[in-house]
A protein has these predicted regions:
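N-terminal, Lys/Arg-enriched amphipathic/low-complexity engagement segments
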Residues: 15, 26-27
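HKD-type phospholipase D/PLD-like phosphodiesterase module
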Residues: 9-20, 36-73, 83-187
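N-terminal Sec signal peptide cleavage junction
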Residues: 1-2
Length: 187
C-alpha cells in the first residue's frame, strides 16, 4: 500500500533578517547565485530576500521535522550523522529514507562508524540488515567515515585501545538537507 503524506510546509521563521547586502557573505551569495544562473538553475528564488532559522528544542519535534523533510523531498536528501542506531527512531528514519529512494529521490548518507556500534547481537543483526537494504538500493549511497575493519564489539574495542588516531578522528556532524533547500542541524 502507498502512504500519502502532506507536502512539506515551510514554517514561519522564529528569527529572520534581510539577506546580507555587503561584506563577505554578500559576495559569497552573489558568486553562488551567478554560478547557479550560469548553470541554468531554474530554482524559485521568491524567498531570496530573507534568511532565517527555527529552533527545534525537543527531540520529538526534530524527528517530526526530519521525517517531513524526507517525505517532501523530490530530488535529493543528504545526511551526515555521528550516531545511527537500529532503535525505533532509527528504523522509522531508515524506512522513510527507503520510501524516498523508491520515489526516485537520490539519498546520500555518511555515518561515523563509531556511531553504528551495536551493544547486542540482535541489534547488530538489525543494524546489518538495515545497512544491506540501503546499500542494495540504486538511489542510496551509504558511506562509513573512518570505518573499522572489525564489526564486532570486542574487535572494535581492541582497535580503539590500540589506535588512538582512529579513536580521535571522528565525524561528529549531524545534518539532514532536503532538495538543497532546507536543512536540520544538530542532534
Amino acid at each position: 500500500s502507498t502512504t500519502v503524506r502532506a507536502p512539506f510546509e515551510m514554517p514561519e521563521a522564529e528569527w529572520t533578517q534581510p539577506a546580507a547586502t555587503d561584506g563577505p557573505l554578500a559576495q559569497i551569495a552573489a558568486d553562488v547565485t551567478a554560478r547557479a544562473e550560469t548553470l541554468g538553475d531554474q530554482t524559485d528564488h521568491s524567498d531570496a530576500g530573507i534568511s532565517g532559522f527555527k529552533l527545534l528544542d525537543r527531540g520529538e519535534d526534530a524527528l517530526r521535522w526530519r521525517l517531513s523533510l524526507i517525505d517532501s523531498a523530490t530530488q535529493s536528501i543528504d545526511t551526515q550523522y555521528y550516531l545511527y542506531h537500529s532503535d525505533s527512531a532509527g528504523l522509522l528514519f531508515t524506512s522513510r529514507l527507503l520510501e524516498a529512494a523508491d520515489r526516485g529521490v537520490k539519498v546520500r548518507i555518511i555515518i561515523d562508524d563509531m556511531g553504528t556500534l551495536a551493544v547486542s547481537p540482535s541489534q547488530a543483526k538489525l543494524r546489518d540488515s538495515m545497512g544491506a537494504l540501503m546499500i542494495a538500493h540504486p538511489n542510496i549511497s551509504l558511506r562509513l567515515f573512518n570505518s573499522s575493519g572489525n564489526r564486532g564489539l570486542l574487535g572494535r574495542a581492541w582497535n580503539f585501545t590500540t589506535d588512538f588516531e582512529q579513536l580521535n578522528h571522528r565525524m561528529h556532524n549531524k545534518s539532514l538537507t532536503a532538495d538543497n533547500h532546507a536543512t536540520i542541524v544538530g542532534g
